[in-house]
């Protein structure tokens, strides 16, 4: 009986060590990819890259993220792919940031969006890590919500309704927040063991929250 208890304790200890390792590697890689994206965004701003590059970079990064990254995530090549994906997203983001900086209150809008994104992520990450809850029950809600958002985005291309833009941006922030809780909860509870895929998921959530905050702040801070 005592040997069984010792064995169970040993297994639990190893599981905790593995979870902590995945969490640590995820945060380190996430920090590195965010920093690399910032450098690429700055580079594209200095180069004066046109805004059309945003769509091209988004499409290219989606193709890499959906079809290449999952196949390389368990090897060293996965690190190269994740930096390529996040670098593309950062490069495409540069013209968007330049557009907002051109506003009369552009620096304030961009700074507030950055700060808001950091507060949201750190708050959600802290809660998921301390509560150790399993947030997988939110998966259905997130999937349906994403489909609704996609339909709304397509519809608003033609409708051009500011109120719909506000609703879409707010909805995306909520959905991405839920995805952050789900992803970190999965790591903490041992459901996610690949730190490269975990980094990709968290990066996309942070990226979309930042873009959505920019849109909201740009709308409400507009002088029009």
Identify the residue ranges that each predicted region occupies:
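A hydrophobic alpha-helical transmembrane-helix feature that marks the membrane cores
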Residues: 1-224
């Amino acid at each position: 009986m005592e040997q069984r208890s010792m064995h169970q304790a040993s297994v639990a200890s190893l599981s905790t060590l593995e979870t902590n390792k995945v969490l640590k590697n995820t945060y380190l890689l996430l920090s590195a990819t965010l920093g690399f994206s910032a450098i690429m965004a700055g580079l594209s701003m200095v180069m004066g890259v046109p805004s059309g590059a945003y769509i091209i970079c988004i499409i290219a990064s989606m193709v890499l993220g959906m079809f290449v990254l999952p196949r390389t995530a368990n090897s060293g090549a996965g690190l190269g792919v994740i930096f390529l994906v996040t670098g593309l997203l950062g490069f495409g983001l540069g013209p968007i940031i330049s557009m907002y900086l051109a506003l009369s209150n552009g620096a304030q809008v961009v700074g507030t969006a950055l700060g808001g994104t950091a507060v949201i992520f750190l708050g959600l990450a802290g809660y998921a890590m301390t509560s150790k809850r399993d947030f997988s029950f939110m998966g259905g809600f997130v999937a349906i919500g994403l489909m609704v958002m996609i339909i709304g985005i397509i519809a608003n291309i033609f409708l051009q309704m500011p109120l719909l833009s506000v609703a879409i941006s707010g909805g995306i922030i909520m959905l991405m927040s839920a995805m952050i809780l789900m992803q970190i909860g999965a790591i903490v509870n041992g459901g996610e063991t690949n730190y490269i895929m975990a980094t990709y998921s968290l990066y996309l959530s942070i990226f979309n929250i930042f873009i959505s905050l920019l849109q909201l702040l740009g709308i409400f801070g507009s002088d029009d």
